[in-house]
Design a protein with these regions (language model features):
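Short connector loops at secondary-structure junctions
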Residues: 27-28, 51-55, 62-68
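Short alpha-helix boundary/capping segments
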Residues: 33-44, 165
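Acidic/polar active-site rim loop that often engages polyanionic ligands
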Residues: 25-31, 56-57, 111-112
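Gly-rich Lys/Arg/Thr-decorated short loops/hinges at beta-loop-alpha junctions or inter-strand turns
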Residues: 20-34, 155
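Histidine-anchored nucleotide/phosphate-binding helix
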Residues: 39-55
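N-terminal glycine-rich anion-binding loops that anchor highly charged ligand groups
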Residues: 14-25, 47
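Short amphipathic alpha-helices and their capping/turn segments at secondary-structure boundaries
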Residues: 2-17
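Hydrophobic alpha-helical positions that pack around
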Residues: 10, 59-170, 176-181
Length: 181
């Protein structure tokens, strides 16, 4: 997380991208933001994936989704059928599969050597939220100032996902979930 998108899209000259991998595996077990984003914006995400493929000059992309999200797998597979070179890859639920190196291994069976960059495997990995943000930036001329986030936990009466502006105080989101006891 927090690795600049433009750096991943411009790998060092010694490396050549062979595919894009979209990380649709929530990095923590209680998160559901990516799941909700896929259910609500599958078409836009596919357009974003296509744009990412063009940016790194590849004709193959994989979207890794854990198999405990069958509705997202079904929808994303249906939508991907309309796009050349995009394949949804159902993955076994295995923490921490959302890590970039683990995801590369799970999707294309290549390991990132110790001290090496993920691009050394030929894969450029981006998050499903990034694919959606790329769609919005390129197709809608909308800068990234908000994102879907999950606010959850046993102390909340109504755990929820929110489309929140970057910088929204956590107290405001917690209060929207019924507050803390």
């Amino acid at each position: 997380a927090c690795f600049p998108t433009q750096v991943k899209l411009c790998p060092p000259p010694a490396f050549k991208a062979e595919c894009v991998i979209i990380n649709a595996v929530e990095c923590e077990p209680y998160l559901t933001a990516d799941h909700q984003l896929m259910l609500e914006h599958a078409e836009e995400i596919m357009v974003g994936v296509s744009i990412l493929m063009k940016a790194v000059k590849v004709n193959k992309a994989f979207i890794g989704i854990e198999n405990n999200k069958p509705d997202a797998i079904q929808l994303m597979t249906k939508v991907a059928a309309g796009y050349a070179g995009i394949e949804v890859v159902p993955l076994k639920v295995q923490y921490p599969q959302g890590g970039e190196k683990q995801l590369i291994d799970a999707v294309i069976s290549r390991q990132v050597a110790a001290g090496a960059l993920p691009i050394s495997t030929g894969a450029v990995v981006q998050n499903v939220g990034t694919a959606f943000a790329v769609y919005q930036a390129v197709q809608k001329n909308k800068p990234l100032f908000e994102r879907v986030i999950t606010v959850t936990g046993k102390s909340l009466s109504k755990p929820s996902n929110f489309l929140a502006r970057i910088g929204t105080p956590m107290k405001q989101l917690i209060d929207a979930c019924g507050g803390l006891p």
